[in-house]
Design a protein with these regions (language model features):
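Carbohydrate transferase catalytic cores enriched for Leloir-type hexosyltransferases
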Residues: 1-356
Length: 356
């Protein structure tokens, strides 16, 4: 079986979606080795191709990187127009799995996609008009044409049924995995003092303003390290006392900041899954996490849960996590062991084989 796997989002420095795409492809390649042909495909720019090839390093798959000028505009027009099937650009395939933003037309074979979350439909006020428009088009196309829709949590699966009207038999839950670099052993970041850390794109949904308010109430003397680069919308004021803005941190460096922290705080109002929670647990840091049910599967019973809109509750949660440090580290580490990219790849391959 020939499986074409769209990796176009790897054209940019990796954040959550890119990490999922790379990890799920690596897991698929692992379980399909010797049985099926896996092709990583990306119609992208010359600069994007460099990012893609760097991200694919170490994954044993065929690379089919097609370079276009004005690649983003081309992909958007191609997806919306629905002409020129993907077979015009890549050899015939049995499965086409596309990831995010692009939804290429195809002539034959199993059609598969990934739904990371439905924020543009559920909470349109937390997205840009461009994001709402493109994702709404992708969602409609996926609901109408896809044989398989993978989701990263049961929560997102229920949302997909409810908001897109997709029957449960077309939906598969493929949980993300934890890369081996996220482990308790290894270097720790030294920021000159004890700190709490949060890892998030700086945008309204991530709720950094409430976390900053909680930080001002925190009686434990921790600095607040903020990892993440600006997203859209009003930006939080990171110039306060004992706030350490770190900007974008590459994936290879991120475990150091988890390991060095006294606590990881994830105050997000909504997530498709919440991978930063599991990464932090795998590195042995106690976690304080929003009580929104979209984060339940990432947390299990291994985190302190708090009202994301209550600064006092977040501050109290940090105190509880510090008091229960050893217990939460043990619970979190055990919980994180249940998330592997091999298991994610096995879920995908089983579905592809059944549908082909």
């Amino acid at each position: 079986m020939r499986i074409v796997f769209d990796v176009t989002p790897l054209s940019h420095p990796r954040t959550g979606v890119g990490n999922y795409i790379r990890g799920s492809l690596a897991g698929l390649a692992e379980v399909a080795a010797g049985k099926h042909e896996i092709v990583a495909w990306a119609p992208t720019s010359a600069a994007g191709a460099r990012h893609v090839l760097e991200a694919l390093d170490g994954i044993p798959v065929e690379r089919r990187i097609v370079r276009f000028p004005f690649a983003h505009a081309w992909r958007t027009i191609w997806s919306r127009a629905g002409h020129l099937p993907a077979e015009r650009f890549i050899r015939p395939f049995d499965v086409l799995h596309f990831s995010d933003w692009m939804f290429p037309p195809q002539r034959s074979g199993v059609r598969s996609t990934m739904i990371h979350d439905l924020v543009p439909l559920r909470f349109p006020e937390w997205t840009t008009p461009r994001t709402r428009s493109m994702h709404a088009a992708k969602y409609r196309n996926a609901a109408r044409t896809c044989d398989l829709l993978f989701v990263n949590s049961r929560y997102t699966g229920r949302e997909t049924e409810e908001l897109l009207g997709v029957s449960a038999d077309r939906i598969r839950v493929a949980y993300p995995g934890v890369e081996p670099r996220f482990r308790p052993e290894g270097d720790r970041a030294d920021l000159g003092r004890s700190y709490a850390v949060t890892v998030a794109t700086l945008e309204p949904r991530k709720n950094l303003d409430t976390l900053l308010a909680a930080h001002r109430l925190d009686p434990h003397g921790l600095a607040l390290a903020v990892v993440g680069w600006p997203g859209w919308g009003p930006q939080p004021d990171l110039g306060g006392e004992d706030v350490i803005p770190l900007g974008f941190v590459a994936n290879d460096e991120l475990p150091r900041y988890y390991r060095g922290a006294e606590v990881l705080v994830v105050p997000s109002r909504f997530e498709g899954f919440g991978m930063t929670v599991v990464e932090g647990m795998a590195c042995g840091v106690p976690c304080v996490v929003s009580s929104h049910p979209s984060l339940d599967e990432a947390c299990g019973d291994a985190a302190v849960r708090v009202d994301p809109d209550d600064p006092e509750a977040i501050a109290a949660g940090i105190g509880e996590a510090l008091a229960r440090r050893d217990e939460l580290r043990a619970l979190g580490f055990e919980h994180a062991r249940g998330f592997t990219w091999g298991a994610c790849g096995a879920t995908m391959l089983e579905a592809f084989e059944a549908a082909a």
